[in-house]
Amino acid sequence: MIKSDPDVEVYALGKHIRMSAHKARRVIDQIRGRPYEETLMILELMPYRACYPILKLVYSAAANASHNMGFNETALIISQAEVNEGTITKKLKPRARGRSFAIKRPTCHITIVLQDISKDKKYFIWLRKYGWIYKDKYTDVRERYLYMMDHMLYRNRMTWINREMIWPYRDSEVLWDKK
């Protein structure tokens, strides 16, 4: 069950979507934790059939955020996304010699939760590879500074030269000495 903070989170729920939960999870795992605009680009370019209903749900959640809560769409991220199995529709297909085969049509329930990071105080500014980093983890200014330097190294904005981290185009300016 997804618990949401009503001040900064908005969700959209799609029930009885006619596809396998396994196939929908393949797409949901690609968009979880990403910004709203990047999610739209990913969903429009992925070649899976599951992308279209998920794209409609993301649009619906963004419309809920802008209309009901007044959030700006550029500050939204997909904070939570989950896929649950729904009911299975069973039909009988007639076959030769009076027999029949069962046809199972699975459904799934998809929940998309968008979060406005401009109004949320818990999230740290910099985005890392594995998701958003909580601000509570860093207690003093030095730890935040070290994390910012690590982030700049990760994004290839800084390089290591002789155990010192410097800007790529300014060889004389040393920011931090690694000891």
Swiss-Prot record:
Pfam family, one: Ribosomal_L22
Quaternary data: Part of the 50S ribosomal subunit.
Domain of life where this protein originates: Eukaryota
Organism: Ranunculus macranthus (Large buttercup)
Protein known as: Large ribosomal subunit protein uL22c
InterPro entries found in the cross-reference section: Ribosomal_uL22, Ribosomal_uL22_bac/chlpt-type, Ribosomal_uL22_bac/org-type, Ribosomal_uL22_CS, Ribosomal_uL22_sf
Location(s), subcellular: Plastid, Chloroplast
Family per record: Belongs to the universal ribosomal protein uL22 family.
GO cellular component terms attached to this protein's record: chloroplast; large ribosomal subunit
Role played: This protein binds specifically to 23S rRNA.
UniProt record, GO biological process: translation
Source species taxonomy: Eukaryota, Viridiplantae, Streptophyta, Embryophyta, Tracheophyta
Keywords (A to Z) from UniProt: Chloroplast, Plastid, Ribonucleoprotein, Ribosomal protein, RNA-binding, rRNA-binding
Molecular function GO labels: rRNA binding; structural constituent of ribosome
